[in-house]
Each structure stands twice: as C-alpha cells, then as structure tokens.
Amino acid sequence: MNIRKIKLEDSTQLFNWVNKTDSLSVKVENQKKINFSAHSKWFSERMNDPNTSIWIIENKNKIPIGQIRFQKKMDNYFDVDIYLTKHERKKGVASKALNLAINKVNFYSFRAIIKKSNRRSYNFFLKNGFSLSHEDNNMWVLVNIIK
C-alpha cells in the first residue's frame, strides 16, 4: 500500500467514488449525487488550494483504492475525509494510509466530523488517536492534535 498526491487524471476516479452510495450515505454536508461539472470545478479549486492536501491510496499494484483529504475549513483544524473501496476495508489500510498522510504534511491539528449513523468511522478515528471534542444529536466531532 502506498499514498501519492492527486494528479489531474484522478478527477474521474474521485468523481466516481464521491457518488457511490456508501460514500453519499455517510457524508455530513451533502448526501446528493454531484454532477461532473460541479465536481470538476471543486477538483480544480482543491488542486490549487494551499489549504487542501489530497492523497490517493494505492494497493501494491498501484491501483487506486481510496483517498484521504485534509482541508482547512477553520483557523485551527484541517478536516479529514477518507474514502476506501469496500473490498479494502477492515484490513488496516485506512489506518496505515492516514498515518502516512499525516506524516507527509506540515499540519498539526486535525478534525473529523462524523454522522452518528456511522459508528464504524467514529471507532476508526478513536483508534487512530482522535478524541471526542463535542457532539450534538446528529454528529460527533473528533480532534487529533499532533505535538
């Protein structure tokens, strides 16, 4: 398993992943399918944004199997978004990829916002050094401050 920075040619793969049912169902901000035009605009903006870092997770054969995105949305934290294809889950790949990505960036404060219906993601972030900051009826907010 390896991670690499996104390239322009990754746009279609990310578009396909973001519109998968298993991805949409756990999104906090938008659970509707995204059209390619809106995705292309978003992708171009993210590629040119110094406050965003996106990594493609590849298997040992260099086939893309997921992505990790860090995006600064608040002064103090970079929000974490992870997607891993279904057949690669529960193998420790996401934990390894997250740690690799964290070690490649100069960010020190991370935040994960998780829908309460997504207990698996909540447990994943706890297992990977995040702690509960606060919660409401619909979501948990976990943070990890690297020292």
What are these regions (language model features)?
Residues 126-136:
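Conserved acetyl-CoA-binding loop of GNAT-fold acetyltransferases
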Residues 4-33:
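A short, well-structured alpha-helix characteristic of acyl/acetyltransferase catalytic modules
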Residues 105-116:
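Conserved GNAT acetyl-CoA-binding A-motif
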Residues 84, 90-104, 119-127:
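Conserved acetyl-CoA-binding loop-helix of GNAT-fold acetyltransferases
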Residues 6, 84, 114:
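Hydrophobic adenine-recognition pocket in adenosine-nucleotide-binding enzymes
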Residues 32-81, 85-87, 136:
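Acetyl-CoA-dependent GNAT
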Residues 135-147:
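C-terminal "cap" of GNAT-fold acetyltransferases
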